[in-house]
Each structure stands twice: as C-alpha cells, then as structure tokens.
A protein has these predicted regions:
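Phosphate/pyrophosphate-binding catalytic cores of soluble transferases and nucleic-acid-acting enzymes
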Residues: 1-137
Length: 137
C-alpha cells in the first residue's frame, strides 16, 4: 500500500463532472446498535478471536503491522504490553472501542447533507428509493 488515504490522491475534474452520488445511510437506535456491537464481539470470541491473535503473535506479527492496528487486534497487544488486562478486560475494551468507532462514523456521515437515512428493517423502502433514483450509465 502507499500508506496514504484514498482521499489524498487527486481526482481529475472530468471524473467529477456530472457525478451526483446516491448515498444511503442505515441508522439504528443507539441502544440497539450497542447491543448488536456487544453481541458481535461475543461471537468473535466464541469463534476463536483470542486463539487467532495468539497464533498471529507467535508467527511474529507485532502491533506495528498494519493489520494488527485494527479494533479487535490492538487490544490484545495492549493486554500483553500492560500485563494488567484480563481476557474479559480485552473483550470489554474491544466493545468500547467499537462503540466509539461507530459513533465517529455516525458523526462523519451526519455532516454529509446528501445522505438519505433509512432503518435497516425497511429494505423494501430502500429498494424502491434506489430504483427511483438510480441512473444507468
């Protein structure tokens, strides 16, 4: 990889002309979102996340490797470095960090006025909206 975010690369003006993207956002009640995050983290642990990270560490991966900096991996490196976190503590830290990441994403997209927000349970409404607004090139 280049180490640079995609947004740092120039986009020719000819590509931007006539582009009006259709942006759809999915929104949930905060309590529901947080409960889903908690369930997802529990499932990740049930499916062997701790063993996966342990094997990666044994294979020589470190917290400096890009793939190990993501939520769900870096917390294990913190546990090893600090030595004071338990597996339960790591799990709670992953939940907290995921909730914070979700909040940042929501904040980012809320500042984009062209986002059309829907509840994920309204799939028929979303499909109709897309069909009514999709322009085939």
């Amino acid at each position: 990889t280049s180490g640079r975010p995609l947004s740092s690369f120039p986009v020719p003006e000819t590509v931007r002309e006539g582009m009006d993207p259709l942006i759809i956002g999915l929104t949930r009640a905060r309590e529901e979102l947080y409960a889903r995050i908690d369930r997802r983290v529990e499932l990740m642990f049930e499916q062997g996340l701790a063993d996966e990270v342990r094997e990666l560490m044994q294979a020589g991966y470190t917290e400096q490797d890009p793939g190990m900096r993501g939520i769900g991996y870096r917390e294990f490196f913190l546990m090893r470095r600090w030595g004071c976190l338990t597996a339960v503590g790591v799990k709670e830290l992953i939940k907290r960090n995921t909730r914070r990441y979700a909040k940042r994403q929501i904040t980012f997209f809320r500042h984009i006025p062209s986002v059309h927000w829907f509840s994920p349970s309204r799939s028929a409404e979303i499909r109709t909206f897309i069909e009514n607004n999709l322009i085939l090139l």
